[in-house]
């Protein structure tokens, strides 16, 4: 199959603003050839399942050639694929299969650093005067850039590591085996764009750009969010927009919202509108830990406060929000006091901690409480931004805290109650990671096959909620208004989208307490409208002048559409 033959979806420039994303680890999703490692052929086999679930876009973490000392984020070749997970032709077939089902695909692209096994680094360390001599950041001293924090405090004592071959120190913001690229070198910039073009030419729908705040280093700064970094990222955006329209750039910048907004590159036009020439999307990291804090404290204020602190983003841009992913539940963007609280509540065993976070999946974090899992998912699907689900969370998969680093949340997808969870026909010892054997979360009780047969399962509930969300553009495009309310244990907000056929108004009411709670809401601006519950289509009493009273079960929630009654007094659905 040639690149020109690759299937590309139709033009829809802002598709990502209403999309539901799904992160899938290729090596853990499906092994079709009994090799013990999932591959692109296996992932292609399961595209019908992902289409059925309602996924709009797959996010695929790194699958490039790599020593795999950091789950593939240690890249050894930006245009090569790990042999055990397939070939370029296999990737083509997977990409076309996804597009044929209306599913887009973005992949991780690690700009900041490479593996120390990358040929660029090997050439740089062995030939300082050669063409790759200044592809990385080298120094005769380890005293430079002392204001830059060490990110992996558990394992790295410094951001500098001595290289015996070159006789100099090299700079790394992450693990010592991941040397940072030198973006002051124009050849490095060009090499990054060439590697991106390699994948975009195949019809890829975009990239999640990993660790973007750290591209440049400057004395007297913390080496994060520097002007030079923003200029480089704007160059990337221009390159993509000019050559590959309708593709998306999703930035990973684990920063405060006021800093992250700058990664959209907000610029004001003459007509007063604000556009973003840098990223299309950026993750809103601080929301995620505050959802966990709010529910455990039974108080809306952690969520309300961070939403109030979130600036408006440029037109045509979008947040990405998530509950869990392939990394630890990061606690960088909380206070020391809140971090200790989160560790005390959600990581009672020291093995559950990793760096500045918690390495657990969603279901174990919530003690496998179905009501809590559903509430968290409802918040994910209704708060501002495009939601990103993590593979296996739709069935309540567990984790394995006995595995090293973040591998405990990257175990094989549990499809059947058979040996190896329907992931592989290999002997168990050949699997790249062991399956979950836990009596609560083990594959005998938690698997896709069993939940498909049960209409009341978490899987069917998650699918139903995804499809409801996809029917209402207000969830992705609408404004957000926190309604407050009489009860601090209840978080209520309105998502509103103006339209030619009338405004689409969605009212979301969430009980963060484990006990039933009443709440009175000021809905006078919607007087006369009839709340229609979106899951069952049940109309509630019309909104009047008085505070609107609702009672919610423990960890319960409502999604309403506030409809205009027709001439018969019935709600307009």
UniProtKB/Swiss-Prot annotation:
GO biological process: carbohydrate metabolic process
Role according to the record: Catalyzes the reversible interconversion of maltose and alpha,alpha-trehalose by transglucosylation.
Active site positions: 210, 252
Binding site for Ca(2+): 112, 180, 214-215, 217
UniProt key word Isomerase: yes
Gene: treS
Name by which UniProt lists this protein: Trehalose synthase
Catalyses which reaction(s): D-maltose = alpha,alpha-trehalose
EC number, UniProt record: 5.4.99.16
Organism encoding this protein: Pimelobacter sp. (strain R48)
